[in-house]
Amino acid sequence: AAVLASMSMSAQQNISFREGKLVSPQVNSDKTVTFRLKAPKAKSVKVLADWEQNNGQGTLKKGKDGVWEYTTPQLASEMFTYRFDVDGVVGIDPVNPFTRRDVGDVFSIFYVGGGVADEYQVKDVAHGQVRTVWYHSNTINADRRMNVYLPAGYGKTDKKYPVFYLLH
């Protein structure tokens, strides 16, 4: 039996669509994080995030070049999600290619390393794979789709695996 799970995954490519030299977010050596957004015509810009300090909010200040900037207080090691609120319109960071989907919302993400967040990093270990398969359901007399996680090495031996069903 295979380990079965219905899951949502988002792959992340390290693609560079940063605008010139603008870097956001910038995780600093003191575990603060600096956000930047080029919005020369904006009247107000906030960062809305899931860290605890300041209720997860920060107000960016506008620079002469139209780039808004905010640096957080020191953050714990973790994976954080955030979005920008520009004059009441909320969206992801346009120069950060790393995102996470949560049901109907998409968030930009970043990691503050040196602790818990290190567990999110890709490790040099054998990785399994997720396959999308179709099956016929006699109960509803229709074809259904599911995602199946297969551990590394699955199918190469007669080893039996436990089954885990996640329905949501």
Can you say where each PLM-predicted feature lies in the sequence?
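Bacterial Sec-dependent N-terminal signal peptides
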Residues: 1-13
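Low-complexity, Gly/Pro
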Residues: 8-11, 41, 52, 62-64, ...
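The feature marks proteins involved in alpha-glucan
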Residues: 12-28, 74-140
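Structural beta-strand segments of beta-rich domains
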Residues: 31-35
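Aromatic-rich carbohydrate-binding modules that target alpha-glucans
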Residues: 36-77, 87-113, 150
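Short beta-strand elements bearing conserved aromatic residues within extracellular beta-rich modules
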Residues: 45-47, 82, 146
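Short beta-strand element of the alpha/beta-hydrolase
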Residues: 146-168
